[in-house]
């Protein structure tokens, strides 16, 4: 007779969830990234990134033809944004450091931009002065254009040394105050959509700068597409470039961790992780072993691709079997650097999909075949969506998916400490709405409530999740979607000097998770509440 007692199933509060249901040291916060919010593309000594070049060369490939030159002007309004974080009572704020703002030429040898250093020092100091913990991402997809021109960016092994130097500079300048680092955001997303060039203009060399990620947030435009080999390796196909980029991202991550542990760990005592994108891969037929295996394989290609090397120094077995020599092997020295190069796992979760081993007969037009992984994905079964769509594309709302993803990571990836580094939902930017109407975001409010309830349920089952960061703090420039999609808790008025206003979700989040509400469930809230968000019509900024 076993002496091991089963984990008790504790009740979850559903949409009444609040901070009191979590332990006192659980972290609540929100996130952003540099190119999506900062703007000031030509201010303060910043150099161009691949996104600057891409958006200016091919504005027709951004849904509204916009770019991040101004974004939401957080470079100049960062104190106001930090005030918002404080008013919401968040523990943490996640932001990324713009590589070309620190190193305009990409490398240390090309020169350090002291104005960029000063900006991030001011940002970090302002956060700490307001009792907000910084979570800092080193790479959120903004490769300096100089490095893209020199050697094709992450298609070249040369970038590993340049990224290590950039990371070391950040540790030297900011590590005395920053204790929570994320090396790379969503390496799978960056890798999987790299190497695609569009025939406008029709010369491959003119498109060099646009060979970069095509974000998953927006369907690709119906334009002629020409896929071509890298100039750095003429014999490499675009499909192979995907794995070459991923390989170099992993080596760059390991190099950054090595330099930190060798030079800074003893004095700065920081922690590290990568923010890995996930998706619940639900077997189309859970009674079909082939579909179950296909779903497992799909998760390998989504998450295991970048997590497994940190545990074993090798890619997932399914990837090695299917890709063979197309997937580079790590050297013994590289394996030593990779294994254990994390303190926690950052999990980005938005949505779910059905996975099948064969083409679903009822969804032939919608099902997508993933050639390398040998599986199909579809968002519906027998004509019924896996979850309601948030908008016209890609994000089906499936709260139970985050629970299953967390359980999968616990059971199959050595039970790591986990932070939810991104979780959120978009709404279409409807310019016909009044300001009052635009701030009513019931879909997001319910999305956050339902997903947080599932995160709590996973904790009850022993998953070591220790924090939750909403994506995103504010509406921002959403990559290929431009300004057409809004992910923020805070509404940005793009037509009135980027004025900030709280949406209903921000007011709820503040009332439920303010750091002063570290109380037992069902106890009254403190009476000294400053009331900043008491009314959903209160304006945060006045121009």
Swiss-Prot record:
Main location: cytoplasm
Enzyme Commission identifier(s): 3.2.1.220, 3.2.1.105
Cell compartment(s), UniProt: Cytoplasm, Cytosol
Pathway: Alkaloid biosynthesis
InterPro entries noted in UniProt: Glyco_hydro_1, Glyco_hydro_1_N_CS, Glycoside_hydrolase_SF
Name this polypeptide is given: Ipecoside beta-D-glucosidase IpeGLU1
A single GO cellular-component term on record: cytosol
Class of enzymatic activity (EC top level): hydrolase
pH dependence: Optimum pH is 5 with N-deacetylisoipecoside and N-deacetylipecoside as substrates.
């Amino acid at each position: 007779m076993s002496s091991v007692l089963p984990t008790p199933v504790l009740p979850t509060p559903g949409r009444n969830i609040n901070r009191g249901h979590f332990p006192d040291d659980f972290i609540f916060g929100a996130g952003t990234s540099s190119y999506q919010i900062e703007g000031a593309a030509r201010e303060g000594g910043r150099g161009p990134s691949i996104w600057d070049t891409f958006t200016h060369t091919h504005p027709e490939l951004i849904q509204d033809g916009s770019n991040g030159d101004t974004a939401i002007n957080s470079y100049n309004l960062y104190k106001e944004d930090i005030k918002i974080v404080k008013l919401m009572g968040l523990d943490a704020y996640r932001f990324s450091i713009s590589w070309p703002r620190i190193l305009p030429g990409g490398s240390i040898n090309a020169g350090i931009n002291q104005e960029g250093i000063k900006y991030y020092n001011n940002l970090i100091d302002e956060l700490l002065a307001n009792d907000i913990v910084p979570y800092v991402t080193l790479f959120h997809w903004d490769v300096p254009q100089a490095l893209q021109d020199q050697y094709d960016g992450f298609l070249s092994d040369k970038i590993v040394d340049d990224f290590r130097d950039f990371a070391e500079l950040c540790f030297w300048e900011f590590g005395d105050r920053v204790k929570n680092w994320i090396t790379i955001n969503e390496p799978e997303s960056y890798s999987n959509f790299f190497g695609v060039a569009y025939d406008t203009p029709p010369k491959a060399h003119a498109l060099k700068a646009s060979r970069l990620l095509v974000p998953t947030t927006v369907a690709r435009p119906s334009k002629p597409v020409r896929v071509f080999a890298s100039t750095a390796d003429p014999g490499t196909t675009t499909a192979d470039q995907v794995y070459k980029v991923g390989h170099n991202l992993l080596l760059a991550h390991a190099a950054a961790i090595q330099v930190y542990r060798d030079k800074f760990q003893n004095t700065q005592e920081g922690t590290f992780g990568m923010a890995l994108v996930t998706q619940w891969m639900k077997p189309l037929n859970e009674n079909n072993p082939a579909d179950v295996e296909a779903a497992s394989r799909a998760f390998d290609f989504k998450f295991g691709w970048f997590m497994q090397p940190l545990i074993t120094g090798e890619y997932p077995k399914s990837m090695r079997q299917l890709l063979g020599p197309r997937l580079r092997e790590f050297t013994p020295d590289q394996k030593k650097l990779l294994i254990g190069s994390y303190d926690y796992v950052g999990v980005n979760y938005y949505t779910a999909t059905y996975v099948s081993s064969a083409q679903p007969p009822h969804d032939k037009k919608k099902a997508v075949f993933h050639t390398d992984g040998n599986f199909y994905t579809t968002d519906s079964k027998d004509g019924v969506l896996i979850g309601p769509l948030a908008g016209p594309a890609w994000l089906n709302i499936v709260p139970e998916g985050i629970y299953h993803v967390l359980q999968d990571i616990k059971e199959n990836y050595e039970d790591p400490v986990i932070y939810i580094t991104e979780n959120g939902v978009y709404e279409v930017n409807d310019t016909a709405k009044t300001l009052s109407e635009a701030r009513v975001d019931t879909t997001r409010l319910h999305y956050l409530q339902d997903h947080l309830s599932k995160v709590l349920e996973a904790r009850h089952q022993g998953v070591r999740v220790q924090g939750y960061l909403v994506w995103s703090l504010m509406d921002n420039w959403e990559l290929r979607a431009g300004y057409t999609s809004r992910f923020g808790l805070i509404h940005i008025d793009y037509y009135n000097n980027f004025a900030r206003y709280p949406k209903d979700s921000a007011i709820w989040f503040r009332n439920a998770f303010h750091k002063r509400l570290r109380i037992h469930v069902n106890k009254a809230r403190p009476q000294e509440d400053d009331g900043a968000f008491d009314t959903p019509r209160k304006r945060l900024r006045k121009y």
